[in-house]
């Protein structure tokens, strides 16, 4: 939108919604492919037919992308409620047992213990009441042979490299958060480092020119809350109890970046 409005192609977090004031100071609607597909079905078959599927508060289907320790990482599935995250992973991901943890909502989403995520409904309005979100629709299963903190460190490093370079919290805050998290995972944290990491995350939250820094903070804070046993081991400088060799999440271009 910024580019189309004659400005730099960088993200922004406007105080006034684009639906009220957008390009050329006029109301602007931005839709994703899922919304457009729903509009096509509405136009073809009508509202009565459309509302027969899904929940009354959120009719229609939901697109989800499965990742991590599933049968086919990257698989996009269309689900119609009522259903749960566990049912989706069992049916489409061929996940046979409750995983240790699930990352819900994207790489800037929320880590949840597997037993918690398993029972969650795939309904955006209900998830928001439970403090979770479908976000971009990613459901990523943590491999039992991958440390959740090490996986998070990879994600934070990659996300820090994706900065648009337009504000301090992104330019300076995210690389610092990545470095601090790497130190924790490597078992080199000293007394007070965890507190400093949490304080830095708090200071970055909500301060960026867009939502990118806040999303990274959400990922970090949920990891610290979800992976308690691993966190204690790393803080003591012990070898991680999770054996190496598992399947990590795909991160385009991470290995090519310095």
Give the location of each predicted region.
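Hydrophobic alpha-helical positions that pack around
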Residues: 1-80, 92-95
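Ferredoxin-type iron-sulfur electron-transfer modules in oxidoreductases and energy-metabolism complexes
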Residues: 3-7, 13, 120-258
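Structural beta-strand/beta-sheet cores of well-ordered domains, especially the beta-sheet scaffolds
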Residues: 25-28, 35-37, 60-64, 73-77, ...
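Generic beta-strand/beta-sheet core signal
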Residues: 67-69, 79-80, 91, 102-105, ...
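Short acidic/glycine-rich loop or secondary-structure boundary segments that cap or lie
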Residues: 74-75, 110-113, 150
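Short, structural beta-strand-to-alpha-helix junction motif
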Residues: 83-87
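Secondary-structure transition/capping motifs at alpha-helix termini
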Residues: 93-98, 187-191
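Terminal amphipathic helices with adjacent charged low-complexity linkers/tails
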Residues: 94-130, 225, 229
């Amino acid at each position: 939108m910024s580019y189309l409005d004659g400005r730099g192609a960088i993200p922004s977090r406007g105080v006034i919604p684009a639906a009220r004031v957008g390009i050329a100071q006029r109301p602007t609607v931005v839709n994703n492919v899922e919304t457009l597909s729903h509009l096509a079905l509405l136009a073809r078959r009508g509202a009565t037919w459309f509302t027969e599927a899904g929940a009354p508060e959120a009719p229609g289907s939901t697109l989800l992308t499965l990742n991590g320790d599933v049968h086919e990482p990257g698989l996009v599935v269309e689900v119609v409620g009522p259903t749960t995250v566990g049912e989706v992973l069992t049916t489409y991901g061929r996940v046979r047992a409750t995983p240790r943890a699930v990352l819900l909502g994207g790489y800037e989403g929320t880590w949840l213990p597997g037993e918690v995520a398993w029972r969650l409904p795939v309904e955006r309005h209900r998830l928001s009441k439970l403090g979770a979100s479908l976000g971009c629709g990613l459901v990523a299963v943590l491999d039992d042979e991958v440390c959740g903190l090490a996986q998070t460190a990879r994600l934070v490093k990659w996300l820090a490299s994706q900065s648009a370079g337009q504000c301090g919290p992104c330019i300076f805050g995210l690389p610092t958060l990545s470095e601090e998290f790497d130190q924790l995972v490597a078992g080199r944290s000293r007394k007070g480092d965890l507190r400093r990491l949490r304080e830095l995350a708090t200071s970055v939250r909500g301060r960026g020119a867009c939502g990118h820094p806040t999303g990274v903070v959400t990922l970090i804070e949920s990891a610290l809350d979800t992976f308690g046993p691993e966190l204690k081991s790393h803080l003591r400088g012990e070898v991680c109890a999770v054996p190496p060799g598992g399947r990590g999440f795909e991160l385009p271009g991470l290995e090519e970046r310095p």
